């Protein structure tokens, strides 16, 4: 059986002022997809600042195999793209924070 999954991560919900411009940023992270196969779930970070929406989209990272000789995991997924708003902002503090948030939640261990 396949399970449809939609998970918001309440611990990822944050209100910040990362770039210290006296405008709060509101961060939301969620994953969507179908469990039951080996495909990674879609993952999205949305950030609002001063009424403007910014989005980062990609997939979670999952282990697909383990090499006993090198003791390394092989992964699939984990890549992301920024929307135009993020790219046009060119705010390095915001981009760095978004990457840290992404990397904190990108990996989902499989049962």
Residue ranges and their predicted role:
Residues 1, 26-28, 46:
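Long, contiguous hydrophobic alpha-helical segments, chiefly transmembrane helices and signal peptides
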Residues 2-6, 33-39:
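Short consensus segments that form the blades of beta-propeller domains
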Residues 9-18:
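Beta-propeller blade termini
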Residues 11, 27, 39-43:
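Short, surface-exposed coil-to-beta transition loops
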Residues 19-31:
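Acidic/hydrophobic-patterned starts of short beta strands in beta-sheet-rich repeat architectures
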Residues 19-20, 38-40:
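Extracellular/periplasmic catalytic domains that process cell-envelope and extracellular macromolecules
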Residues 30-35, 48-50:
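Short, flexible beta-strand-to-coil junctions
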Residues 41-44, 48-111:
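Acidic, small-residue rich beta-repeat scaffolds with periodic aromatic anchors
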């Amino acid at each position: 059986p396949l399970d449809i999954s939609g998970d918001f991560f309440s611990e990822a919900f944050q209100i910040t002022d990362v770039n210290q411009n006296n405008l709060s940023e509101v961060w939301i992270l969620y994953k969507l997809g179908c469990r039951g196969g080996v495909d990674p779930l879609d993952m999205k970070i949305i950030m609002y600042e001063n009424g403007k929406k910014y989005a980062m989209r990609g997939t979670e990272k999952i282990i697909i195999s383990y090499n006993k000789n090198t003791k390394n995991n092989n992964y699939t997924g984990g890549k992301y793209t920024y929307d135009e708003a993020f790219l046009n902002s060119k705010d390095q503090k915001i981009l760095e924070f978004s990457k840290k948030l992404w990397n904190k939640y990108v990996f989902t261990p499989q049962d």
